[in-house]
Design a protein with these regions (language model features):
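Conserved catalytic core of nucleotide-sugar-dependent glycosyltransferases
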Residues: 5, 246-334, 338-348, 352-359, ...
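Short, acidic, metal-binding catalytic loop of nucleotide-sugar glycosyltransferases
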Residues: 137-140, 159-172
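Short aromatic-hydrophobic micro-motifs that form the base-stacking/packing surface
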Residues: 238-242
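Active-site-proximal specificity loops/subdomain of glycosyltransferases
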Residues: 176-237, 249-252
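A conserved hydrophobic helix/loop-capping motif in glycosyltransferases and polysaccharide synthases
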Residues: 142-152
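Extended non-globular C-terminal regions
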Residues: 2-7, 403-519
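N-terminal signal-anchor transmembrane helix specifying type II single-pass membrane topology
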Residues: 1-84, 88
Length: 519
């Protein structure tokens, strides 16, 4: 990528992220890492890099960047584990994979400062993962995506979108609901187009002219139907409607999940939200933040019937899409539920959801609003170990469970029933009281009570990730902050987990031990 484009991307990203995440409990360094790492991922994934031995200065600079992003209080304790992944067709993703090793067996290096060089791995652990081909050409142009949002929000969202959208061929239609005339913002639109081009995103901007008497978020979102019809492409097999905080783990996997359905027929495909409370309130529909998908024949019918459907508006886009489908189709096109699309209308500590071992995992929503987790950074693992390893649970011999890209948890009193979801969350905004067993029964199954953090459950949470040379390795940093009352000797604690595909000479000490997961 040209230096000018990188500077433009960094400037736009910094401004946009500041405006959108002002009220989100994220460390500023985490988003500095995101802005810097996304261009690195793109450039290194499109051209091969010649591995070279890392110098002490290179290692020190990389360590310094990571430590600054973590917001640690020195001195701190540090452990490091390295995995050498081996993609194989013999392995499939399951809810829980057993690894024949003690993850925390090596005592931590204690009392490190921010200026110390982080200790290297003593060995590399070989781990089989589901097969993927990082060199395979990606073409998901048959999937045409659309989002209704504001100019500032799409500005902030493009870097995260690029994690899963760059270079795929899928067009992104952006309905700018705060811009009735794009000519009035020609310079700003031009900068957004340049930003998207640098990120290899095929983007289309469309203005929105709402009714001055009656307008709503629902009408704005449903206006995508006519916009899709205006920009229809002959190769489109599916239209996908998303929110600006919808994150796809893998667009090829998403398109593969739609393969059983004939796009020449009318289809309305999506997922319910997690809690029975909201389903009872809003009815049976595809929730928009999880992403939902409409076949071309049905989209054409909805676009042609837009004027007839607008009076049905109740204020929410996904409700209006459903009600229009009910109004104009005969026989009625009913919702087809697709597992793996996740609305995540959950509040509070949602670690129980992330650590529940859900599969498939196609989309994640609300990751920067109702809750915060650096999903774009967490997803770096997919470029090195494949999409099926993202949020995969690995259980180790020492009663430790790593949810890849989210957390490392030690259970001092033995493993709980990991087949049950830990009920750490509530079902609505600002609700602290945990719901009853039946609230999530249809979506998550039976649950178990939340464990006492620090006593029954000791957790390190992913706070930062960065690629190594040629995007053939990724460094993950899981952090446990010191808690008042833990004792005078308690410190912030970091577990670095490094993953590599192939050998990167000089980066790690590779005394390989086979700890292949039993899947």
């Amino acid at each position: 990528m040209p230096r000018r484009s990188l500077l433009l991307l960094a400037t736009l990203t910094a401004a946009a992220l500041f405006s959108v995440f002002l009220l989100v409990p994220a460390t500023p360094h985490a988003w500095k890492g995101l802005a810097g790492s996304l261009p690195q991922w793109r450039s290194s994934s499109t051209k091969s890099a010649t591995p070279s031995t890392s110098t002490v200065a290179d290692l020190a600079a990389a360590d310094s960047e990571a430590l600054k992003a973590l917001g640690l209080t020195a001195p701190f304790d540090f452990r490091r584990r390295c995995f050498d992944v081996r993609p194989t067709k013999r392995v499939q993703r399951t809810s829980l994979a057993s690894v024949k090793f003690d993850l925390l067996a090596i005592p931590p290096s204690q009392g490190l400062t921010m200026d110390d060089l982080l200790p290297p791995c003593q060995e590399s652990l070989k781990l089989d993962v589901p097969f993927f081909d990082p060199r395979a050409k990606i073409d998901t142009s048959a999937l045409f995506l659309g989002v209704a949002t504001t100019m500032s929000r799409v500005h902030a969202s493009l870097p995260a979108f690029s994690r899963w959208l760059s270079g795929t061929g899928s067009p992104l239609l952006v309905l700018l609901v705060d811009q009735p005339d794009l000519n009035e913002q020609a310079a700003a639109i031009g900068m957004l187009r340049a930003m998207a081009a640098d990120l290899e995103i095929d983007i289309i901007f469309e203005p929105y002219n709402g009714d001055v008497v009656h307008d709503s978020e629902g009408l704005k979102n449903f206006a995508l139907a006519e916009a899709f019809d205006k920009y229809q492409r002959p190769g489109t097999r599916w239209y996908g409607i998303i929110d600006d905080d919808t994150f796809f783990v893998s667009l090829p996997a998403m398109l593969q999940a739609l393969k059983p359905y004939d796009p020449a027929r009318p289809w309305y495909i999506g997922a319910l939200t997690e809690g029975l409370f909201r389903v009872a309130q809003e009815g049976f529909k595809a929730w928009g933040g999880a992403g939902f998908f409409i076949s071309p024949p049905l989209m054409s019918q909805l676009a042609a019937s837009a004027a007839r459907c607008r009076p049905l508006d109740q204020g929410f886009g996904d409700i209006l899409w459903r009600d229009c489908i009910l109004e104009v189709t005969s026989p009625t096109v009913k919702l087809t539920q697709l597992p793996g699309l996740n609305q995540i209308d959950l509040w509070g500590d949602i670690s129980g959801w992330y650590e529940s071992g859900l599969h498939p995992m196609l989309t994640i929503h609300h990751w920067k609003s109702w809750h915060f987790h650096p999903i774009p950074l967490a997803s770096f693992i997919t470029s090195v170990a494949g999409p099926d390893t993202f949020l995969q649970r690995y259980v180790f011999n020492d009663d430790v469970v790593m949810t890849n890209g989210f957390s490392i948890v030690h259970y001092p009193h033995g493993l709980p029933d990991l087949n049950l979801t830990e009920l750490t969350f509530a079902e609505d905004v600002n609700k602290m009281q945990k719901p009853g067993q039946l609230m999530f029964h249809y979506s998550l199954g039976a649950t178990r009570p939340a464990l006492q953090v620090g006593r029954e459950k000791v957790s390190w949470e992913l706070k930062f990730a960065a690629f190594g040379p040629g995007a053939k390795s990724v460094r993950q940093f899981y952090v446990k902050k010191r808690v008042e009352g833990e004792g005078d000797g308690a410190r912030d604690s970091v577990i670095e987990v490094d993953w590599q595909r192939g050998v990167v000479p000089g980066d790690w000490t590779l005394n390989a031990i086979d700890v292949s997961a039993a899947l």
